[in-house]
Amino acid sequence: MAAMTFHLDVVSAEKKLFSGLVETIQVTGSEGELGIFHGHTPLLTAITPGMVRIVKQHGHEEIIYVSGGIVEVQPGSATVLADTAIRGEDLDAAKAEEAKRKAEENIQNQHGDINFAQAASDLAKAIAQLRVIELTKRSR
């Protein structure tokens, strides 16, 4: 029996990263991890820095980093509108490690000119990128 599929678009302000039929997606929503399958109840929710794990037709997997945005689920389709979206294999581990180090330093050494909320957001994004890099390496 063939797996049930639905259409998925993953787009950012810069470009469309993915468009096609998928069996399932996993995305980090504002309330936690979401698993979306064919026939999912319609939904519109914010997504936080993290990954979109896509299981394409025939079980092939792709992982995309998103810095935030929204996911909309409709009967037969889903759309991820991301602030920034980068394929896992296109992420730079050295840059992500450096961004993580800088954010941690800014949080620890708070000065009047450092915005704690911005530093925490930068840290969350860097950690999410490193997680996507690790998962991409494992899925190869």
Swiss-Prot record:
- Topology in the lipid bilayer: Peripheral membrane protein
Q: Where in the cell is it found?
A: Cell inner membrane
Gene Ontology cellular-component terms listed: plasma membrane; proton-transporting ATP synthase complex
Record keywords, A-Z: ATP synthesis, Cell inner membrane, Cell membrane, CF(1), Hydrogen ion transport, Ion transport, Membrane, Transport
For whether the record's keyword set contains Membrane, the answer is yes
The domain of life is: Bacteria
**Chloroplast listed as a keyword:** no
GO molecular-function terms, A-Z: ATP binding; proton-transporting ATP synthase activity, rotational mechanism
Q: Which Pfam families would you find in this protein's record?
A: ATP-synt_DE (PF00401), ATP-synt_DE_N (PF02823)
Instruction: Describe its function.
Output: Produces ATP from ADP in the presence of a proton gradient across the membrane.
Q: Which family does it belong to?
A: Belongs to the ATPase epsilon chain family.
Q: How does it assemble?
A: F-type ATPases have 2 components, CF(1) - the catalytic core - and CF(0) - the membrane proton channel. CF(1) has five subunits: alpha(3), beta(3), gamma(1), delta(1), epsilon(1). CF(0) has three main subunits: a, b and c.
Protein's name according to its UniProt entry: ATP synthase epsilon chain
Q: What is the lineage of its organism?
A: Bacteria, Pseudomonadati, Pseudomonadota, Gammaproteobacteria, Vibrionales
